[in-house]
Amino acid sequence: PEKEIEFKYPLFDFPYLNSIIEEHNLHRVRLMNLKSKTCYSYHKDQGKRFHIPIITNENCFFVVDEEIKRFPADGNYYILDTDKKHTAINASWYDRIHLIGNL
């Protein structure tokens, strides 16, 4: 049966994004902007993160257990295991934006 979702505020009515959230059973979904020339601390979280790169370039990357990983904005999604030590680095002159959700 088709499930209809009603939103109290039209701001949250994004059929395409909502279909991705539902299809992958994501929670705590957010748009994350990593400012140019910044990085996060090297840390661990719990669980896996679903990433859809929206705006990025070759100077934006992750370091996961001392291995560099790049997620291009090619329309695909990527899974990051945040149980491992990791950081995100933006060494470019432009902000990086990802849609991120917890799995």
Predicted regions and their residues:
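A short beta-strand-loop-beta hairpin characteristic of the jelly-roll/cupin
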Residues: 53-73
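A short hydrophobic beta-strand segment most commonly corresponding to one strand
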Residues: 50-53, 77-79, 93-103
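Residues in well-ordered beta-strands of folded domains
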Residues: 30-32, 53, 63, 89, ...
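Short, conserved beta-strand element in jelly-roll/cupin
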Residues: 33, 44-60
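Residues that flank catalytic or metal-binding motifs in active/ligand-binding sites
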Residues: 27, 46-48, 95
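Short beta-strand-initiation
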Residues: 37, 47-49, 83
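Signature of the catalytic double-stranded beta-helix
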Residues: 1-34
